[in-house]
């Protein structure tokens, strides 16, 4: 599945709150599957499904908080440097400024969802 979705439709259809959009009017989604980037945030990129919508749940956010700030910066820089379509953060876990700045730097749309991780995952997969 490869499709282009208007950002506005994506936001409205999934009831997302945009944190950073950049100039993008569309998202190129290559799969209805999602990627939970725990392995990538730990530094493993060998089998990274970068063409999927990326979903940060409580585990990913808490893991990032546990890292030394310099290590966290390096991991975020590496992760966001890949051509990922967008990142959704579940459970209204508003990201810290470091995540927002790196998303801006690499022009990766960043969204917030009030839903728990499983619910937003299911909605994205059928969207």
List each model region and its residues.
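Gly/Thr-rich phosphate-binding loop signature of adenosyl cofactor/nucleotide-binding cores
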Residues: 1-79
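Feature captures the catalytic cores and cofactor-binding loops of soluble hydro-lyases/lyases
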Residues: 44-55, 59-127
